[in-house]
Amino acid sequence: METSIDKKCVLGLIACAMVAGPALAQGASDAQIFTNTKEIKWTDAPPSMPKGAKVAVLQGDPGKTGPFVIRLKTPAGYKVAPHWHSQDESLTVLSGTLYLGMDDKLDPKSAHALSAGGFHFLPGKVHHYAFSKVPTVVQINSNGPFDIIYINPDDDPQKAKK
């Protein structure tokens, strides 16, 4: 009788280790990060984004494979032309209001308004656009490398005629 209980305990411990092991290993090489708002370092958004936005990398490296967390700060009147990304992204509005539309043309009338606290999950390769009427800050969680492919290549700020 005791042998049966001992075997069940051992099997239970093995099952727990199998479930917990990958989760523990996943973050084992990552140091914990604590960042307060005043400590965030904002820089100009990459050249693939329209000028005027600021970005802060909170975790990971958007230019490399793997998870990352960034914040994007946009001025009033900021617009990102229709585009798509290779990876899924989760977006949370921290302040202001972000307008998102799912189409190949920017149409302010059909955009969804997401105010502070609002959340949007966007599967990879979905065509969309975004704009803000007031200064807005969003947090984006995704996997790198981050890319932005404009539906109309002429909308790509990197290819804009100077």
Model-flagged regions — what are they?
Residues 2-12:
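Bacterial N-terminal signal peptides that target proteins for export
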Residues 11-21:
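Bacterial N-terminal signal peptides
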Residues 24-68, 153-162:
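A short, N-terminal "cap"/entry segment at the start of jelly-roll beta-barrel domains
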Residues 33-35, 109-112, 131-162:
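Double-stranded beta-helix
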Residues 63, 104-125:
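Short acidic-glycine-tyrosine-enriched beta hairpin
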Residues 68-85, 114, 124:
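Conserved short histidine dyad/triad with adjacent acidic residue
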Residues 75-78, 84-105:
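Glycine- and acidic-residue-biased ligand/ion/polar-headgroup-sensing regions
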Residues 80-82, 100-101, 122, 127-133:
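Short beta-strand His + acidic residue motifs that chelate non-heme Fe in jelly-roll/DSBH
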